[in-house]
Design a protein with these regions (language model features):
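Sec-dependent bacterial lipoprotein signal peptides
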Residues: 1-26
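Electrostatic cytochrome c docking/interface patches
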Residues: 23-38, 54-55, 122
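Conserved beta-strand positions that form and line the central face of beta-propeller blades
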Residues: 25, 50, 66, 92-95
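Detector for the c-type heme attachment site
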Residues: 27-28, 46-52, 86, 98
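Gly/Gly-Pro-rich "capping" loops immediately C-terminal to redox-active cysteine motifs
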Residues: 32, 36, 52-78
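Flexible gly/pro/ser-rich segments immediately N-terminal to CXXCH heme-c attachment motifs
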Residues: 38, 71, 97-100
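The canonical Cys-X-X-Cys-His
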Residues: 39-49, 108-112
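C-terminal capping alpha-helices of c-type cytochrome domains
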Residues: 80-91, 97-122
Length: 122
């Protein structure tokens, strides 16, 4: 009976290790080029090609977010930025939740973070 328990425990450990290896291997890394391209095709129209915020989308409306705003960048986590992208904002930004998958969101958020650091470097 003891050998059966040892075998069962060994099997569970092996399956757990295999599962962890698979999940780590399947998780895609941030792709800077993809983040830049997604921004250019989806965000730049309102937020400006360089991320400095564009003109209001509608008369009397707020200006789109300036991603060079260091305080804004520091006050929000990557998860908060992803939620804004996924859900949109009441200020006129539409929801992009059905457009981007998790890996694309990570790449896009990484690009938004780079916009702030690029301005700081100038």
């Amino acid at each position: 009976m003891t050998s059966l328990r040892v075998a069962a425990a060994a099997l569970l450990l092996t399956l757990g290790a295999a599962s962890a290896a698979l999940s780590t291997g399947c998780e895609k890394k941030v792709d800077p080029a993809q983040g830049r391209d997604l921004y250019a095709s989806t965000c730049a129209r309102c937020h400006g090609a360089d991320g400095s915020g564009g003109l209001p989308v509608f008369d009397g409306g707020p200006r789109p977010r300036n991603f060079h705003d260091h305080a804004f960048q520091n006050e929000r986590t990557d998860e908060q930025l992803k939620l804004i992208i996924v859900n949109g904002k009441s200020t006129g930004m539409p929801s992009f939740g059905v457009i981007f998958d998790e890996q694309q969101l990570r790449s896009l958020v990484a690009h938004l973070r780079r916009l702030d650091s690029e301005k700081a470097a100038k």
